């Protein structure tokens, strides 16, 4: 699965299908993260039968390998804050792509907060330049949490897959009311039933 993801685009299996199949076979898939990902998707050790797959930055639409190399060099032992990531020299558009991909979880910033921070921080710093380090007070704005469906939509828009839920899960009840048969039940149907 890891090699298939690194070989994209191939024209047939989409990343979401590869990840879904790997998960169905017991493989742990870990998200893109500023502190853990490399350009390529990689295998990580874990207890159990299989290695885990860490999604690489190549999964994030619009990122360039050169930008990722800057990030990887700058992170050293790891970023502790989003402020440190911003100071790495990445452009605002790269930071926004990373935020859209929800890649700041290890620095305790969820997608919406990270998007807010990377899209406003530079503009605010330019107007009110100060030399203080990032503090909790810098994050006093309480943004509403994103709904799971919003996360999934944004995951697909930014990485072509979601580790949070399948898009059909949000309409499963309506499909059941329409008497649609889930694909997992098709093998139980007799000819002419479906």
What are these regions (language model features)?
Residues 1-194:
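Noncatalytic, beta-rich nucleic-acid-contacting surfaces in large DNA/RNA-processing enzymes
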């Amino acid at each position: 699965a890891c090699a298939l993801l690194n070989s994209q685009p191939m024209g047939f299996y989409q990343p979401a299908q590869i990840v879904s199949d790997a998960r169905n076979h017991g493989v742990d898939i870990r998200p893109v993260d500023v502190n853990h990902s490399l350009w390529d998707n990689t295998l990580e050790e874990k207890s159990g039968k299989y290695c885990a797959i860490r999604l690489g930055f190549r999964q994030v639409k619009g990122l360039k390998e050169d930008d990722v190399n800057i990030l990887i060099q700058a992170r050293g032992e790891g970023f502790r804050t989003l402020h440190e990531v911003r100071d790495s020299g990445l452009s605002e558009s790269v930071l926004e792509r990373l935020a859209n991909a929800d890649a700041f979880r290890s620095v305790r910033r969820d997608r919406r907060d990270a998007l807010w921070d990377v899209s406003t921080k530079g503009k605010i710093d330019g107007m009110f330049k100060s030399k203080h380090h990032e503090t909790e007070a810098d994050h006093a704005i309480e943004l509403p949490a994103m709904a799971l469906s919003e996360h999934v939509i944004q995951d697909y828009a930014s990485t072509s897959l979601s580790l949070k839920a399948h898009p059909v899960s949000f309409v499963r009840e309506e499909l059941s009311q329409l008497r649609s048969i889930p694909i997992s039940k098709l093998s139980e149907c007799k000819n002419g039933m479906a």
